[in-house]
Amino acid sequence: NLFIDDYAHHPTEIENVLSAAKDSKLTNNIIAIFQPHRYSRIQSLYSEFSKCFKKADLVLVTDVYAAGEKNTNSFKIGNFIKLIDKNSKVKTIHIKSIDLISKYFDNNKKNLVIFMGAGDISNKAKEFYNKFNN
């Protein structure tokens, strides 16, 4: 398995990262782990986010890293997941814990796991990498 930690937290960045990963042909299974950053960003780019994961084979979405913001517009992660699944045409799952990621690996494939976001996802990526490789 290969692991990448990327600061991508905007739809264009996410699309570019996944496109480069697909074009690299390093693997035949790309798992995108996305931590949404700020309710205001997700809501203002809701449609764009729903379409930017097309090059992934599986998308795992964590809870929103609020960065001090309140969920004033009643953002629902379940609706966000369904829209990504529909518009990006990729299986999308909400995960509450990074520890659950390996449950989604296909051990018959070489997985490229890309952690993306601007919150504390980098710390979680390091923790997961260390746990997975020990």
Task: For each feature predicted by the language model, list its residue ranges.
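Short glycine-rich anion-binding loops that position phosphate/pyrophosphate groups of nucleotides
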Residues: 9, 36-39, 64-67, 118-121
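Nucleotide phosphate-binding/pyrophosphate-handling subdomain across enzymes
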Residues: 1-58
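Secondary-structure boundary motif
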Residues: 23-27, 55, 86, 107, ...
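Predominant activation on well-ordered alpha-helical scaffold segments within soluble catalytic domains
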Residues: 15-18, 81, 122
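Short glycine-/acidic-enriched loop or helix-start segments at secondary-structure transitions
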Residues: 43, 70-71, 123-127
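C-terminal helical cap/extension that packs against the catalytic core
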Residues: 2, 50-109
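A glycine-rich beta-strand to alpha-helix segment
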Residues: 99-134
